[in-house]
From Swiss-Prot:
Pfam families: ASL_C2, Lyase_1. InterPro entries: Arg_succ_lyase_C, Argininosuccinate_lyase, Fumarase/histidase_N, Fumarate_lyase_CS, Fumarate_lyase_fam, Fumarate_lyase_N, L-Aspartase-like. PANTHER family: ARGININOSUCCINATE LYASE. It comes from Clostridioides difficile (strain 630) (Peptoclostridium difficile). This is Argininosuccinate lyase. One of its GO terms (molecular function) is argininosuccinate lyase activity. It comes from the Bacteria. Keywords: Amino-acid biosynthesis, Arginine biosynthesis, Cytoplasm, Lyase. It catalyses: 2-(N(omega)-L-arginino)succinate = fumarate + L-arginine. Pathway: Amino-acid biosynthesis; L-arginine biosynthesis; L-arginine from L-ornithine and carbamoyl phosphate: step 3/3. One of its GO terms (biological process) is arginine biosynthetic process via ornithine. The gene is argH. Belongs to the lyase 1 family. Argininosuccinate lyase subfamily.
Amino acid sequence: MKLWGGRFRKAENQLMEEFNKSFGYDCVLYKKDIEGSVAHVHMQVKCGLLTEEEGKSITEGLKGILEDVENGKLVLDGEYEDIHSFTEINLIQRIGDVGKKLHTARSRNDQVAVDMRLYAKEKANDLVGLISEFKATIKDVADKNPVMMPGYTHLQRAQVVTFKHHLMAYYSMFDRDEKRIKNAIEILDESPLGCGALAGTTHDIDRSITCEQLGFKKVVDNFMDGVSDRDYLLELMSDFSIIMMHLSRLSEELILWSSQEFGFVEIDDLYTTGSSIMPQKKNPDGAELIRGKTGRVYGNLFGLFTVMKGIPLAYNKDMQEDKEGFFDSVHTLEMCIQIMDRMIATLKVNEDKMKQAVKNGFLNATEVADYLVKNNVAFRDAHGIVGSIVIYCEDNKKAIEDLTLEELHKFSDAFKEDIYDFIDYESILNKGIKKNLK
């Protein structure tokens, strides 16, 4: 049974039928489809399209379908065109012809639009919760590890920072991500139910009833936009892509830092794997998979952009292609955030390795220049002097702080005994606004 027909002289081609079906993936919308239908029935009764008795029968039938799906008595499988067909066909089989009245004053166009908004809103709120928990994990691990480490530019050692400050940079990123998703929720929080196929309905319905029951902030302003808008999915998927980019950057650092070449951190065994041939290997597969799956989420976003770019108003079947990519991106992001949260929570920080890397990289060179500036040397001259000192240190395999005052005087008479305290790494982190690094 289909929800359409009558005007066709030929039955649908079997290949076309398979090509047209979406039930294999839009079945995940079953809760939202039933939730939206229950609200629609409530509105139908209020507006005189159904009697109280009819409304009660349909509502109980819908809730029975939901209960049976939840407890496994009714399986989301079969030759249904889509989730809407599944719901309506099973309803009619349960309660008889009165179930055929469910679709009065509704189209699958506004039905799927409300299903997707409800689903997107719920999943977006779930992600806000996951990000909030992840931020708490980041802050906890950062606060417990205020140890010094090299800060990098161009992946070259640059200046001394702290692991805490480095990790809290990601806190700032994910804090912005959380705000972006909350903003997207605010924008999508409009009900399209009642828009019909594209032009509303001749029935004197009240869209505010379903809007309020479904928890939306307001109804959409335009019927045609209401059924053809997928901006909210594009916005959320853009936000997802930015989050994945941030997760990928953090993954890359964990991969580098956990290598023997760095040794700054150790990823817990729970989130690593081994090699089938090399017994010694401990591979950061959790982080690598997050890095790899970032491209997958990007691809889903650009796939939907491409779907939507040439569609005239209003609904077109192309829009069926909005679902798989969105569902996949949501699932991927949920998994990646949770895996990263656990990796960070169980991360072991190697303080000694980080300190050793600081001392081997001339990371106090900028502070040597600052010292000269404080002693009336122009910064550009100071910059050149310190560059020459670094070359001298490299040639003689020394750190700047290990040079004698006599050696330093070869480059400038501005150096005094207090230079050593000034460029001590712990001392550096207590000067000026660098105190904010700790």
